[in-house]
């Protein structure tokens, strides 16, 4: 069963504008210098259940303010987390078709596309922004938008095509 680390209902750091951020638990990358090392252990955090997605859906429109949605980790696209990540993203997109959904992954886009399964393709066809690539400490640059190191890319989905928009 998948696990998650945290839900932050009013996050202004991770994403576009005010977001609800969902941190999945478990990461195979173990990037040196990672800001979120406590999310590496696949057995840590909290057990995911269907009530979690409803908590997120309610938080997105709490106090009549619609927020965007961010999915971070841990590694949302790790095989152990893929079904949970899709379940949450699918529910959020159906409830809020016009919000921006951003997902961070330590996998590069080319790694993801080398052998994608249906669940991964569903996720990539539903989110709006993909921040891809592992954090590399020697490439660290805290002035970058949405990224921690220069090797990472911001990809925006437009007309079912991904465009790099690193600036």
Predicted regions and their residues:
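A short, well-ordered alpha-helical element
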Residues: 53-62
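Charged helix-capping and loop-helix junction motifs
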Residues: 49-54, 82-89, 115-121
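Core AdoMet radical
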Residues: 36-51, 65-79, 98-113, 124, ...
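Catalytic-core regions built around general acid/base machinery
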Residues: 88-95, 122-126
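Canonical Radical SAM [4Fe-4S] cluster-binding loop centered on the CxxxCxxC motif
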Residues: 15-51
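Alpha-helix C-cap/termination motif
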Residues: 62-63, 95
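P-loop/Walker A phosphate-binding loop and immediately adjacent motor/lid segment at beta-alpha junctions
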Residues: 80-93, 140-167
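Short, charged low-complexity linear segments at domain edges
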Residues: 1-18
């Amino acid at each position: 069963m998948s696990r998650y680390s945290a839900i932050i209902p009013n996050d202004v750091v991770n994403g576009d504008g005010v977001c609800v951020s969902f941190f999945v638990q478990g990461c195979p990358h173990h990037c040196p210098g990672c800001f979120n090392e406590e999310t590496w252990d696949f057995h840590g955090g909290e057990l995911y259940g269907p009530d979690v997605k409803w908590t997120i859906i309610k938080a997105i429109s709490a106090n009549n303010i619609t927020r965007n949605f961010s999915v971070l980790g841990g590694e949302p696209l790790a095989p152990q987390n893929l079904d949970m990540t899709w379940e949450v993203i699918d529910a959020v997109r159906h409830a809020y078709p016009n919000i921006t959904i951003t997902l961070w992954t330590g996998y590069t886009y080319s790694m993801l596309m080398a052998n994608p399964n249906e669940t991964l393709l569903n996720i990539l066809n539903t989110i709006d922004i993909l921040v891809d690539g592992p954090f590399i400490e020697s490439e660290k640059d805290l002035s970058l938008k949405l990224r921690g190191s220069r090797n990472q890319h911001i990809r925006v989905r437009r007309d079912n095509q991904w465009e790099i928009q690193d600036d």
